[in-house]
């Protein structure tokens, strides 16, 4: 497989400008990432409860929407974008607040359609014009680091908050799963054991899967996790495609009114501001990949990521309205793929693209099989919590490594704190003044006040 590419070059592709890469032709399926994805299949199903409550969608339709959304993630890695994509997660409380201002039923669905299509339009315009690429190219290191720190702190605060279920409801199972996963993924001893033992290297290749399984078993033994039920109620999930199209899409209920389009504009802008941080995190992780594995050049192009994200939002907005919207990256999944690729040899994992694609093949296919989902569903909090921990760890160490001066570190720290402390808070009765907006403003003011020197060209990440 590694013969397909020269040392340090981009993996070959078909399709010209589209950079189409096909499984078993351009890369192999990495069964370790496939299994990690299958285990995490229960995590995206967690949004179905909110979809049922807020949108009035039957649970079978909500599950079908999640499955369709998951398969569309494959558009990124199939067409040359290294993103392990996901939702625009940070804005979910804002979307729910916005939607509850409309009458339940078709009007509320139309409000979501307007919001999601407008978000897609913003991604499309900024991607095609290259505006975002220019902004990122000139984005100060201190502010990049601040966004990474904020993302890391936000993840870890959720895990260690006693009000959250991770430590509150299953402390023994979650702590054991976390310690096992962190040892395998990040320990210096584990890296040495990988080189000394082929068996340990094989087990470590599964990433969080060993820790998840051990934590699951401990949870069953301690009673912190309930045994799975309804495993064999059916084999394949229900697929009420006709009901979904006729009752919950623009194809069945029509397009939003003019007033609904106007009402969604400000929140659509907020959603893009939230997603902008994910783009910076993605770029930092891919850069980390290229430094750790110089045998392959993984290319991240902001316009490509934007255009694919735009297509997902516009298509889903019309045909599969999706409450969390479609974002450019899922940081937790990205961290798992990046970490395994970094610590694998070219023989163990020949190409980044095999792992980045396999995690979603595993997740998407597993969600179709009802028995498998019912087996892993009781431990979904362990899987979700592990991704948050790993996301927080990687974001924080990348943020620290990025800064070169104490001024940059100070700006990054203030910006990260602003992002976390103001998150989900609407100041001046406006959703725009949420945590990410305040963090960007605070970071920009401090950069120009403390760091910027107009007499010389500022250092930026190219």
Where are these regions (language model features)?
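Loop-to-helix transition at the N-terminal end of transmembrane alpha-helices
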Residues: 55-78
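Membrane-interfacial loop-to-transmembrane alpha-helix junctions, especially the N-terminal start
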Residues: 60-62, 301, 407-412
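Alpha-helical transmembrane segments of multipass membrane proteins
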Residues: 49-50, 71-75, 98, 124, ...
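Helix-loop-helix hairpins and the membrane-proximal interhelical loops
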Residues: 1-59, 196-200, 204-300, 459-462
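Helix-loop-helix junctions within the multi-pass membrane cores of secondary transporters/permeases
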Residues: 14-29, 36-47, 81-151, 295-392
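Membrane-embedded alpha-helical modules
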Residues: 109-225, 354-462
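Residue-level recognition of pore/gate-forming positions within transmembrane alpha-helices
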Residues: 66-70, 89-90, 444
